[in-house]
Amino acid sequence: MQHESPTHGMNMSALRRHKQRLDLADETVAIEVPGLNLFYGDKQALFDIALNIPKQKVTSFIGPSGCGKSTLLRSFNRMNDLVDGCRIEGAINLYGHNIYTKGEEVAELRRRVGMVFQKPNPFPKTIYENVVYGLRIQGINKKRVLDEAVEWALKAAALWDEVKDRLHESALGLSGGQQQRLVIARTIAVEPEVLLLDEPCSALDPISTLKVEELIYELKSKYTIVIVTHNMQQAARVSDYTAFMYMGKLVEFGDTDTLFTNPAKKQTEDYITGRYG
């Protein structure tokens, strides 16, 4: 009996998509993008994106400004729904389930797929109330449960020792780096499965950046992490896999060491060596 290859009968576009995706067993894929196009009104922002995001690894998106990195990231928890005129063609599967299915509970999706933005955005509340905010929304108000969640989340975010004696002080009194780690604590307090980080260190000093990078390394044992960064050195330091994007297209995707030391595409090499971008 003849066995056809997985690519038999594919057109060239589909074949290119197949080759870009990592060959991972189903149980090791957190997010599968089999072929995504995204539009803002009449303008197409993402073109035929296909990739698999590995579970409990750090995947970074790199590329010049405006290449679609953040747009792709925000599609993973449907933040783009908030932009007028945004529509997609295709699917994004979170552990095998298409998150763009009609009737999808978007609030629950955003609990499962948490997001940390470029600029730290603590609420004008106490440190304690920042961490428990999402839990209270879920109807959890028992003090013992909240206390345990605060300690656990702040320890996981490497912030507990710095703030444990000031939990009932305003979060706005923290440094920028502390605020960003607090936001991460707030995000993981509701026990997501995926963390999306949109340039989380761009507003931080080098010491704070190092602490956040160390935190990312610690968190990947429990969470799937996807990070957008303009800092290629940061991508090389913290990520297991890297995707290079240009003008809304996925140029190359693979393990970080290989992509940075032996890229398959000249366009990737030109970008990481500073020839453009």
Curated annotation (Swiss-Prot):
GO biological process: phosphate ion transmembrane transport
EC number: 7.3.2.1
Complex formation: The complex is composed of two ATP-binding proteins (PstB), two transmembrane proteins (PstC and PstA) and a solute-binding protein (PstS).
Matching InterPro entries: AAA+_ATPase, ABC_transporter-like_ATP-bd, ABC_transporter-like_CS, P-loop_NTPase, PstB-like
Gene3D superfamilies: P-loop containing nucleotide triphosphate hydrolases
Organism: Pseudomonas savastanoi pv. phaseolicola (strain 1448A / Race 6)
Binding site for ATP: 63-70
Location in the cell: Cell inner membrane
Primary residence: membrane
Domain ABC transporter: 31-272
The entry's keywords: ATP-binding, Cell inner membrane, Cell membrane, Membrane, Nucleotide-binding, Phosphate transport, Translocase, Transport
Domain of life: Bacteria
CDD domains xref list: ABC_PstB_phosphate_transporter (cd03260)
Function per UniProt: Part of the ABC transporter complex PstSACB involved in phosphate import. Responsible for energy coupling to the transport system.
Family from the record: Belongs to the ABC transporter superfamily. Phosphate importer (TC 3.A.1.7) family.
Protein name: Phosphate import ATP-binding protein PstB 2
Molecular-function GO terms, alphabetical: ATP binding; ATP hydrolysis activity; ATPase-coupled phosphate ion transmembrane transporter activity
Topological relation to the membrane, as annotated: Peripheral membrane protein
Reaction equations catalysed: phosphate(out) + ATP + H2O = ADP + 2 phosphate(in) + H(+)
SMART domains: AAA
